């Protein structure tokens, strides 16, 4: 908690850019709500002792940082916030930082709620989108469906969906009861009549009191100096070394960090810059556009900086009434062509390269560096966003996008002068990032960036632009088939459970399974019964409805997450191709991640996985060529551990899972091989006996016995794993095959975090090293790609190409050779090659 709170303080100014800050604190003891209902908050479990011990430290931190806090006996922090809102919201914008949904009732014209978990600001529309009710209906909503966290009862039997529908029709709790005689005679009406007293009491409990006498804001000003500098002793006491390091960096920084923002809008200015550029070697470059979607965004302007004293902005397409003259696009292209002959520095260059290619037809430059990637190599678990980096390394508050661009508008509507300040700052701070990282990153990591991560940017750029074709008719057929199956399953579930309910509501589902049907449940939490996959799988043999629910969920997710969204995307493109975005810095291990849409999560297993993947097809005259590294993480285990038996098995090309099965069970039949496969891969991810017993459906003692036999068969592996964890604890990081580091704060970890860090330190070694290898393979493959052979997807250890039919086999074999020889390990790398017209048919 202390670490999290310190990080929260460190990011406050950066995230909110506020003039004032007030911490509202709960009072000790009972509040006036306990007089309304003695059971209010009565069932709350006692907070963990570690949390109770750390809370006073956090309050001490607030006091020592001289930040404003307020507490009122008999009232909750929420009431204090409501009173501040009432007093000040007419004249200033207020952001409420909270996890609690009851505070959404305070949202208004100048009041928004910020969710720390989602890192999102919610206004009136955001409240409706999140909860399905307007801010003024939040109290009514809680009056109906209650709030288990605070033991607010609500109306028993009416959940969130029912509450939303009632409020949509009637507007408020009072109006519902005014019209209750007009409601159809059904179970819901009976529940409303029976629960009326609870409903109005619950609404009263959920209503915030805003009549407290709160102080003025004198003394609540946001400090100009970093408040954490006042509590360095506390930070040292709790070993918050990363924060202390950032503070140390900020002390060494020139706090003025001034530069001159220059707007370039005439040919004469551009000609002078072209002349000045002749003596420039390195230049930071950034684009401003109409959208974050680089595939469709239009350029509005671009900025560049080479000496930290001045930074330039070239406006091209500002379209507001009264916008000044801007540089001719042909002249702008000449400028970019000249800039591209230099060493380019950018923050998320893949985006800028695509914008320039799409808007000017220019291919990326030969030499470049990306500070986002350098920041990620420095600390892969931390934010690599520009605003956060500026604050972390220079204690500098950048101009925020939302303070420049009005809601619902884009950068083209921004006044050119304001745009110049914002955009010029982006280029200027990017240049500073580059110089900073060149000074603090190790030579090994700088070399890794130069030789692997930077060239990989172009590989991803081209892969994303290729997209992949969808078979529209197959998708539609699948959508109809799933819809029909869901309809049948819904009726079967209703029949087996004896009632109709919202199957997608975890609350209603939990009540049906564990209360109405009486099935055994794990302990009920404040949010209700657990109905996740593992919880349902554990009781799937106890009632016929449970397997139906699991099948329903699988199909519903397939429909809502994949088939319907993919169809919508495919129909937007003339060739029915969809285009994903691959994130190079999206994971801590080094693996790529994919979004909009996430093509790496297309189901590979399940009843309809092949059918789903077969909706992805090659274009006419071309085939998919799939190349998949075989057991790469197990081969890395052999490489790192030097276990003699494992080395021998791979060198002799044995079936490693059969070999493991024989070592543990003395036989390698299909069933035993499957168990061995689970053990082989599970141990790499830090799986213990408890997890293995759940995975295999066996007793914990049997699972423990299997693991002991495994380590007996492969004697060196256990020592290697233990040494790997010990090194991570000693050094505070794990290193991958190519030298990337992932850091773990073992010193300040809770027991649960400590165990997680141990697992992740092992996982990162293998998953991160596998990511290194396939990235290097993709870079080495890229010179062989052209209009006849294009790389479409990377699915972790697998590459999928679209290749002209007549060369598909020879191309596949050539790529196979490259992939298998991209790095020299103590065991051979092996890939499987498959060629087909549909993704699902690749073996």
Located regions from the model:
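Conserved catalytic core of nucleic-acid polymerases
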Residues: 412, 465, 572, 579-580, ...
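Noncatalytic, basic helical substrate-engagement surface that gates or grips nucleic-acid strands
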Residues: 1-97, 101-123, 198-215, 219-220, ...
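Short alpha-helix plus adjacent loop in nuclease-associated cores
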Residues: 42-53, 109-133, 189-191, 315-329, ...
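Conserved RNase H-like, two-metal-ion catalytic cores of nucleic-acid enzymes
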Residues: 1-20, 38-50, 59-64, 253-393, ...
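C-terminal polymerase-core module
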Residues: 484-491, 495-548, 712-765, 802, ...
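Active-site palm subdomain of RNA-directed nucleic acid polymerases
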Residues: 441-452, 456, 775-799
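Conserved "right-hand" nucleotidyltransferase catalytic core of DNA-directed polymerases
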Residues: 191, 195-319, 344, 362-364, ...
